[in-house]
C-alpha cells in the first residue's frame, strides 16, 4: 500500500509511506525556501518524480485559518480526535481512497508510528503546540480512548512572551511568531525564576490564564513591566525562565494526577523541541520511557496524517523510518575552478583544518526531516573557543545569545558531559563538564543540546569525529544548520557556493569531495 499525505498551512509538507516504510518526508521550506513555507507545487512535483506509481491512498491533513469574519477549514479541520473520513475518489485517473483527519490527530499518530514498538497495555501521548495542549490515553489497539485537556495554546503563550518584550512586535493584530519560541528557550537560560518579583510573576500568571493568544493581546499588557522591555532585558530573561518552569509544572501536575503511571510517554507538537522540557519529562519518573520524534513539530504533520491513514486501514501505526528521508543534494552547477579547487575527502586532513579554526560547510546524502541539522546539512567548527560560537552566529546572521550545539561521538560522551545517554536527534539538554573546555558549545547555564553519533547511525560523521579525537582528544565538533537566515536547509550547489562565498567560508564538503577556496 502506497500512501501520500499533504500538510496544508504553514510548515507545508508531503510524505509518502510504502509498505510500512517512510519513503520521503519533504518540507517545502527545505532547499532554501522561506521558513514555515506552505506547501509548494515544486514540493509535490519533487515527490511525484520519485514515486514509481500513483498512490493507493491520498491523505489530506486538516487545517483551519482565522479570517477577518470567519474560520476557514481545510479537510477535517484543525482540532478534535473524531474518526477520520474515508471516501473513494480519483487521482490522475486512478481510483483511490481519499482520507482526511484533523491536525490534532496528525500529531498523535506521528508520535505513535515513529516511537519504538511497546507492548504496554496503555500508552500516553502528549500534544503541546501552538494551539493544542492535551494528553491522550492510547489502548493496545492503537485507539484514542481518552483525552485530558490541560491548556489551550501552550506554544503560543510561550512565544507571546517574546513578542510582549519585543518593541518590533505589533501592539494589536499580531500573531505569536513561529520562530520566537526557540529564541525564548535560549534566553531562559540567562534567567533564574527565583529572581522573579511580584510584577514579573503577575505577568506570567496572566499569560497562563489568558483566554486566547489569537490575535496576540499585547495591548492588554501595556501597563506591565515586560511591555516592550527588550528581549535581552533582565526582566524578559527572568520571565522566560519562570514561564518555562510554570508551563512544565502545569502539564506535569496533570500527568501525575490523570495519566497512567508506568506507561510510555510520546511527545508531539512544537513544544517537543524545547530541550529543557524534554529533559524534565525524562526526569519526572512517572512514565516508563519518553520518546520525542525529530520532526515533532509541524514538519512531521504530513507524516502523521499518513500514519493515521495507515492505522485506519491496517490497525498498526508503526513504520520503518530514517531521519535522513529528505531529498538528495542537487548538483545544479560546479564551483568555479578559478575560485575553488576540489580534492578527495581525507578525514584526517579535514579534522586538522577544523582543529586549526576553519569552518566547514558539510553536506552528505539526503536532508534531515525536522528542523534540526543532524550532520547532513551542517556547518562544522572546533568546539573549544568562545570566539568560534560568536563567529558561527555572525555567519548565520543571528542573535549573539543563541547557543551553538555540539555533535559528539558516543565513545566520548562520558568524558565531556555529566550525562552519557544517547540523543541522536538533539532533543535534550545535558550538563557540560567544566574540564572539557567546550566553550563554543556550552550555554550560559552550563548546558548543551548534543547530537550523539554512532558509526551505524552516521558513518561519515563518526569517522570525522574519530579523526578529530585523534588530534584534540575528544570527538566533539560544533554543529549548526547550513542555511540562509530565515530559510530552510541549503540543498543545491549554486546556493552552497553563494552562501560560502558571501560569508567567508573557505571549505565545503559534498559527499566525498572537499572543495577549498583558491588563494589569491
Swiss-Prot record:
The keyword Transferase applies. Keywords: Antibiotic biosynthesis, Transferase. InterPro entries: Carbam_trans_C, Carbam_trans_C_sf, Carbtransf_dom, NodU/CmcH_Carbamoyltrnsfr. GO terms for biological process: antibiotic biosynthetic process. Transmembrane segments: none annotated. The keyword Cell cycle does not apply. Its EC number is 2.1.3.-. One of its GO terms (molecular function) is transferase activity. Pathway: Antibiotic biosynthesis; cephamycin C biosynthesis. It comes from the Bacteria. It is an enzyme of class 2 (transferase). Catalyzes the carbamoylation reaction in the cephamycin biosynthesis. Belongs to the NodU/CmcH family. This is 3'-hydroxymethylcephem-O-carbamoyltransferase. The gene is cmcH.
Amino acid at each position: 500500500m502506497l500512501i501520500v499525505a499533504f500538510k496544508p498551512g504553514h510548515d507545508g509538507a508531503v510524505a509518502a509511506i510504502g509498505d510500512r516504510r517512510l519513503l520521503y518526508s519533504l518540507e517545502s521550506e527545505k532547499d532554501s525556501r522561506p521558513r514555515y513555507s506552505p506547501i509548494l507545487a515544486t514540493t509535490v512535483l519533487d515527490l511525484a518524480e520519485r514515486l514509481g506509481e500513483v498512490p493507493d491512498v491520498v491523505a489530506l491533513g486538516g487545517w483551519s485559518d482565522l479570517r477577518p469574519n470567519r474560520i476557514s477549514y481545510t479537510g477535517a479541520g484543525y482540532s478534535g480526535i473524531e474518526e477520520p473520513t474515508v471516501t473513494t475518489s480519483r487521482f490522475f485517473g486512478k481510483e483511490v481512497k481519499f482520507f482526511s483527519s484533523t491536525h490534532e490527530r496528525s500529531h498523535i499518530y506521528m508520535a505513535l508510528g515513529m516511537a519504538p514498538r511497546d507492548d504496554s497495555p496503555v500508552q500516553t501521548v502528549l500534544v503541546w503546540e501552538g494551539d493544542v495542549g492535551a494528553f491522550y490515553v492510547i489502548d493496545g489497539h492503537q485507539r484514542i480512548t481518552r483525552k485530558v485537556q490541560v491548556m489551550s495554546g501552550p506554544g503560543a503563550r510561550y512565544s507571546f512572551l517574546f513578542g510582549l518584550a519585543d518593541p518590533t512586535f505589533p501592539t494589536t493584530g499580531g500573531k505569536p511568531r513561529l520562530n520566537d519560541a526557540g529564541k525564548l528557550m535560549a534566553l531562559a537560560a540567562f534567567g533564574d525564576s527565583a529572581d522573579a518579583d511580584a510584577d514579573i510573576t503577575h505577568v506570567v500568571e496572566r499569560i497562563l490564564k489568558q483566554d486566547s493568544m489569537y490575535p496576540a493581546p499585547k495591548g492588554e499588557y501595556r501597563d506591565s513591566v515586560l511591555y516592550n522591555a527588550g528581549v535581552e532585558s533582565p526582566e524578559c530573561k527572568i520571565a522566560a525562565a519562570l514561564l518555562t518552569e510554570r508551563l512544565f509544572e502545569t502539564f506535569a501536575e496533570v500527568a501525575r494526577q490523570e495519566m497512567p503511571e508506568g506507561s510510555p510517554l510520546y511527545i508531539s507538537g512544537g513544544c517537543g523541541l524545547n530541550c529543557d522540557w524534554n529533559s524534565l519529562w525524562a526526569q519526572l519518573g512517572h512514565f516508563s520511557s519518553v520518546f520525542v520524534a525529530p520532526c515533532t513539530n509541524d514538519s512531521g504533520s504530513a507524516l502523521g496524517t499518513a500514519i493515521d491513514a495507515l492505522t485506519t486501514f491496517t490497525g498498526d501505526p508503526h513504520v520503518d523510518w530514517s531521519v535522513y528521508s529528505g531529498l538528495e543534494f542537487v548538483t545544479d552547477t560546479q564551483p568555479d575552478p578559478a575560485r575553488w579547487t576540489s580534492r578527495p575527502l581525507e578525514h584526517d586532513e579535514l579534522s586538522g583544518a577544523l582543529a586549526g579554526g576553519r569552518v566547514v560547510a558539510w553536506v552528505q546524502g539526503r536532508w534531515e526531516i525536522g528542523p534540526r541539522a543532524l550532520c547532513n546539512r551542517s556547518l562544522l567548527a572546533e568546539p573549544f573557543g568562545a570566539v568560534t560560537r560568536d563567529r558561527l552566529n555572525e555567519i548565520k546572521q543571528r542573535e549573539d545569545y543563541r547557543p551553538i550545539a555540539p555533535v559528539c561521538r558516543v565513545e566520548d560522551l562520558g568524558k565531556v558531559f555529566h550525562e552519557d545517554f544517547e540523543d541522536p536527534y538533539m532533543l535534550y539538554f545535558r550538563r557540560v563538564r567544566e574540564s572539557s573546555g567546550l566553550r563554543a558549545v556550552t550555554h550560559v547555564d552550563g548546558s548543551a543540546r548534543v547530537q550523539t553519533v554512532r558509526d551505524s547511525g552516521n558513518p561519515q560523521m563518526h569517522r570525522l569525529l574519530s579523526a578529530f579525537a585523534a588530534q584534540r582528544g575528544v570527538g566533539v565538533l560544533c554543529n549548526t544548520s547550513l542555511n540562509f537566515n530565515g530559510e530552510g536547509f541549503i540543498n543545491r550547489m549554486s546556493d552552497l557556493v553563494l552562501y560560502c562565498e558571501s560569508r567567508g567560508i573557505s571549505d565545503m564538503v559534498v559527499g566525498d569531495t572537499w572543495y577549498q577556496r583558491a588563494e589569491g
